[in-house]
Amino acid sequence: MVAIFVILTIVAFIVADSIVQWSQAKSEQRHGDTVTGRRRESRRVADLIPAFAFEGISVPQGIFVDAGHTWVGLKASGRTHIGMDQFAQNVIGRIDEVELPEVGREVRRGEKLFAVRQGDRKADFVAPMDGVVSSVNEELGRHPEAIKADPYQQGWICALKPKNLAKNLKQLSIAEEAAAWLDKEVQRFQEFFALRPIQSMALGYVLQDGGRLTGGVLELLDDETWHLFTSEFLQRKVATNQ
C-alpha cells in the first residue's frame, strides 16, 4: 500500500507540473501574440504615413533647410526669412500658438529661436544661423493657423540680420541635396513611428476604416511621443564650426 501511495504521489506531482508548464506556455504565447500584434499594427500604420501624411511635401527652389526642420530664405535686403518647414508642420498638425522671438535679440546657430504650441504641448525650434532678429511676423501671433497656409512665404516666422552668412549657408541644404535629405527624414520618421505604441482610439479607427492620414499624426499620440519627436527631430545637435 505504501508503495502504491508513493507511486500515486509521484504521478500527481508529474501531472501538476505538466499543467503548470502548459499554463505558462499558453500565457507566454498569448503575450507574444499581443506584442507581435502591436508591432504589426504599428508597422501597418507607419506604412501609411509616407504615402499620405507627407504627400506633396517638397522644398521650393531657392530655400535652404536645416537639420532642425527650419528653413531660410534670402531676401534682396540682405536679411533672411526663417520659418518652420512643411515636414514638421505635417507631423505636428494643429498649431494653437506661435511664440515669436524678441526683436533685437542676438542668436547663434543651434540656440532656441521660436516655438509652437498645441494645447499644453510645446515644440522649440533652433536657429539655423547666427544673427540678430530684425522683425517678426506679427500676423502669426494673431492667427497661428496661417503658418500652414503658405509655409515658405507668408508663413515666415522671423527675419534675421545674418552675422556669418557665408559660413552658415554651407551648413544648410538646398535644391537636390535638400530634397534627398527630406526623403531620408520621412523614412526616419516612419521607423520612429513604427516603434511607438498606438495610444489613441481615434488613430485606431482611422486605420480600421482605411482612412487617409493627411497629417497631424502627433495630435493622436501621447505626450511621450511628442517629446521624443521634438528631441530627435527638432533639437538635433548642429555643427557650428564647419
Predicted regions and their residues:
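Contiguous, well-folded functional domains in the mature portion of proteins
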Residues: 1-242
